[in-house]
Amino acid sequence: MAAVSALCFALVSAIAYLFLSSATLHRGDKMKITQLYVYPVKGLRGCALKTAPIGPYGVVGDRTFCLQKVHRDGDGVRYETMLIGYNLQMALFVTSVDYDKGLASVEWKGRGTAFDVAMGITTPDTISFPLKPSTSGCEKLEVNLHTSKASAYDLGDDYSTWFADRLGCEVRLVFIGDGSRPVLGSIAPNSPGGLRRARLSHRVRSLFPFLAYPAERLAFNDIAHFLVVTEESNDQVSSRLEDQCQMDVTKFRPNIVVKGASGAFVEDYWGELAFDGGLKMALTANCYRCQSITVDYDTGATATDDRGMAWKKLNKDRRVDAGAKYSPVFGRYGYCFGSVADKKFRVGQGVAVAHVNAQRTVFDWPHLTTFGTTKK
């Protein structure tokens, strides 16, 4: 009986500790969401939202499609995930979503640019497809994204030809469907590696099956479910640019932009955010930047003014992650805790910093420490 009582006391104490620790906020930055974005097709430009419904892999519909470049040789067919860091012309494609109709749309704005390989193509420069298309009869292929693999559905010739005509190469549009990708390294907060470096309260929670969260997985998001950036840091990047050039925050491809941080780049140390309404988000990794931040949206090429120098100027003093020491850091990758069914982010929503790390996190996704440092 004494042993049972002791066990019950320990259990109650652990649960009380979890709730008390989760209720404690860092007394610092109190902010608001000012911008929200979703990117239905990986690598293409995103779509601004007023409210962002949350699903199991981030914003609903975020990066559930991607383009696979087809390589054919004597050994057969090989597929390569198209990434904007190596294919800046992908910025000529602008996406939008209509959640009420369940549709994603893509508009190509490449007419008259150096990438206008579509001369003579008479099909409309806008195409739409369901956010959750039927996969009946679709062929499956393996997608390899940063060595994290998933089985995906090829959506057929009509959609793929539309993109191929405008990219000038053979591509396939694929849909993640019921598939998902593993999170590598210790970036997923509820993976074994993530829990080893998590705060004590999260490690204690994982010991109880009825409280533990499952390990996170991904669609075609690079590294995490969400990317959070601040207006203060973006303004600091603008201050580095000459000739009154301004940094467009969308080139950092965030899901959530917040305003009200105490300074530029203070988010490097943020470990957890608490949003009004009860949502909590673990921030587990820095986002180190590729060449996509240098693109000119009007040309699909590196900007010829000082905006084209953004990566180099950041690289002078923003190589602050020992795990990705050749690239500048801007923004934090995050995952929401617990059930997010039917929950939403909204512009104007309050945000508080719930935990500040003593040191910057170290990026440890295998074989991904030099991505985007050069152009292919």
For each feature predicted by the language model, list its residue ranges.
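Metal-cofactor-dependent catalytic cores
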Residues: 1-376
